[in-house]
């Protein structure tokens, strides 16, 4: 147990944490660590630049979208403002109609024709629009239609007045294709004239069955606000898709009818193309409130849709939480913004190929190339320096080993042995453990050299060193101190234990024959002297070695090939 304890304590003392760290973190590991830190920091800085660049790219996409959305909103707002103006004029006309003879005549004419299947009242084609209507019988068949109101005459004159305003408001430069007032009392006024009276019922019922009319009932539109509706063409129809902005006309809590303006989708498509900067890439798409595709600025998708149902669902989910934003879909960046004066959303789609061709793409490519170049140079530098450090470390280790070891026997040389012995002796003295020394000298070695040559002598020394090393304990230290003489240090071993080790060495040396030439073998022997600190309490290694050396010569005088552990031969 004492031997095991000394072994453990010896290792704990000699292998301090600094030495352990130095052994584990050799020069190669330090170089690797430094280059890894540099690579991580360079990658982190590059990543930070990428994040800043991405934020700038997203802001740029939103700014481009906002510019187009604002331009489209202004035009739509202009039409909404006209619609509100017309409604206010209609309300004033309902409350205080103009007392013109022509208007009174129009009311009289209505009373004369109201029972006819279809009728038209026209004052002056250059100044106002005609009022087109159906009979009382047809009106009574509709659920939302009614002529049972006290202000029916005022509504007729108000319709003629608003027809005059509609003609003035409608012009070729406007986005609006048709402006109209449709009454629940069975008549309508439209900027698109009805050429034949027989077409009036069909056209009227086409109006009152549209969502933009039905959607303004007091149950459907309780706030009586402006609403937008989309009409999609049927499969077999030639009707062009359009959006309709409409507003209810009420007075004294009675719903009279609906004012509306229809804008063709092709007109909005043309406006989108005109509003976009020609130097910018990206596609703009207009959707209604239910994310139904209306139009696109891309000629390749005039009536198509580049989003599949899953992507539309993702887009709808993102739009639930904000009025503007962006989302990545595969290699595309999709930004969107809800319009203020249209019940829909404007979407901008920017593909990866378009981004690469743009300014941000050029900066991203340059940044990537710089990072790749820096990383490549860093790796090349790491490889060169790592090889240099590795070679220097190997050379240093080789020189250090040669400085501490005997190259022939591969045991410690004299200087290294003394360096090892002193701290071991001091440690044993501190813990009051024995410290023993064995001196070994090969018998008749000079005769072997003289008879078989120095090469044979070198082989004998190497053979003997191997046998000595194989006979020692793990904590023992052996070295060649000169010529054919060896020294063994045994920390924690008593004199008796050291003598047993010495006897084991002697037996191993003597019992094995050695081939030194063709058909020539020899058997070697050795004389050994043993000393220990137990005898005198002296832990001085040089004194113990001198004592062991003296006993070695006593063994030689006693006939060689023996162990001497006392001064009595």
UniProtKB/Swiss-Prot annotation:
This is Probable diguanylate cyclase DgcQ. It catalyses: 2 GTP = 3',3'-c-di-GMP + 2 diphosphate. Pfam families: CHASE7, GGDEF. It is a multi-pass membrane protein. PANTHER family: DIGUANYLATE CYCLASE DGCQ-RELATED, REGULATORY COMPONENTS OF SENSORY TRANSDUCTION SYSTEM. One of its GO terms (molecular function) is diguanylate cyclase activity. The chain crosses the membrane at residues 25-45, 365-385. Catalyzes the synthesis of cyclic-di-GMP (c-di-GMP) via the condensation of 2 GTP molecules. Cyclic-di-GMP is a second messenger which controls cell surface-associated traits in bacteria. Involved in the regulation of cellulose production. Its main location: membrane. PROSITE patterns: GGDEF. Its EC number is 2.7.7.65. The active site is at residue 484. It is an enzyme of class 2 (transferase). The record marks 446 as: Transition state stabilizer.
């Amino acid at each position: 147990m004492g031997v095991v304890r000394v072994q453990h304590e010896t290792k704990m003392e000699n292998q301090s944490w600094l030495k352990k760290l130095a052994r584990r973190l050799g020069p190669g590991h330090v170089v690797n660590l430094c280059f890894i830190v540099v690579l991580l920091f360079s990658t982190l800085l590059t990543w930070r630049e990428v994040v800043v660049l991405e934020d700038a790219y997203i802001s740029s996409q939103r700014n481009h979208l906002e510019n187009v959305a604002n331009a489209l909103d202004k035009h739509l707002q202009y039409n909404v403002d006209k619609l509100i103006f017309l409604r206010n004029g209609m309300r004033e006309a309902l409350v205080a109609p103009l007392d013109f003879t022509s208007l009174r005549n129009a009311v009289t004419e209505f009373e004369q024709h109201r029972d006819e299947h279809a009728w038209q009242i026209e004052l002056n084609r250059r100044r106002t629009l005609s009022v087109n209507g159906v009979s009382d019988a047809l009106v009574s068949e509709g659920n939302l239609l009614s002529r049972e109101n006290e202000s029916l005459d005022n509504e007729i004159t108000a319709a003629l007045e608003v027809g005059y305003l509609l003609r003035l408001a409608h012009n070729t430069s406007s986005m609006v294709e048709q402006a109209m007032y449709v009454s629940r009392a069975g008549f309508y006024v439209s900027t698109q004239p009805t050429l034949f009276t027989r077409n009036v019922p069909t056209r009227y019922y086409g109006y009152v069955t549209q969502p933009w009319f039905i959607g303004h009932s007091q149950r459907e539109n309780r706030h009586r606000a402006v609403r937008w509706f989309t009409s999609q063409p049927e499969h077999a129809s030639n009707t062009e898709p359009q959006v309709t902005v409409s507003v209810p006309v009420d007075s004294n809590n009675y719903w009279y009818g609906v004012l509306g303006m229809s804008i063709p989708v092709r007109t909005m498509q043309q406006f989108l193309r005109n509003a976009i900067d020609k130097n910018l890439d990206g596609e703009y798409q207009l959707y209604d409130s239910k994310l139904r595709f209306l139009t696109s600025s891309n000629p390749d998708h005039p009536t198509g849709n580049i989003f599949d149902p899953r992507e539309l669902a993702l887009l709808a989910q993102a739009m639930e939480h904000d009025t503007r934003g962006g989302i990545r879909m595969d290699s595309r960046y999709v930004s969107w913004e809800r319009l203020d004066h249209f019940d829909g959303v404007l979407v901008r789609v920017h593909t990866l190929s378009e981004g690469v061709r743009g300014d941000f793409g050029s900066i991203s490519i340059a940044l990537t190339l710089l990072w790749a170049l820096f990383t490549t140079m860093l790796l090349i530098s790491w490889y060169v320096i790592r090889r240099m450090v590795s070679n220097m470390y190997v050379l240093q280790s080789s020189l250090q080993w040669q400085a501490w070891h005997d190259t022939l026997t591969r045991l410690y040389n004299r200087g290294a042995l003394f360096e090892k012995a002193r701290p071991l002796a001091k440690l044993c003295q501190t813990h009051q453990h024995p410290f023993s020394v064995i001196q070994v000298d090969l018998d008749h070695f000079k005769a072997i050299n003289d008879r078989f040559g120095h090469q044979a002598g070198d082989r004998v020394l190497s053979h003997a060193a191997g046998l000595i090393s194989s006979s020692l304990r793990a904590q023992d230290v052996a070295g060649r101190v000169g010529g054919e003489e060896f020294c063994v240090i045994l920390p924690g071993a008593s004199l008796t234990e050291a003598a047993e080790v010495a006897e084991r060495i002697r037996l191993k040396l003597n019992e094995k024959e050695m081939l030194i030439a063709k058909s020539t073998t020899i058997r070697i022997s050795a004389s050994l002297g043993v000393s220990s600190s137990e005898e005198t309490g002296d832990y001085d290694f040089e004194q113990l070695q001198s004592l062991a050396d003296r006993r070695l010569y006593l063994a030689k005088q006693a006939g060689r090939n023996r162990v001497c552990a006392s001064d009595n031969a």
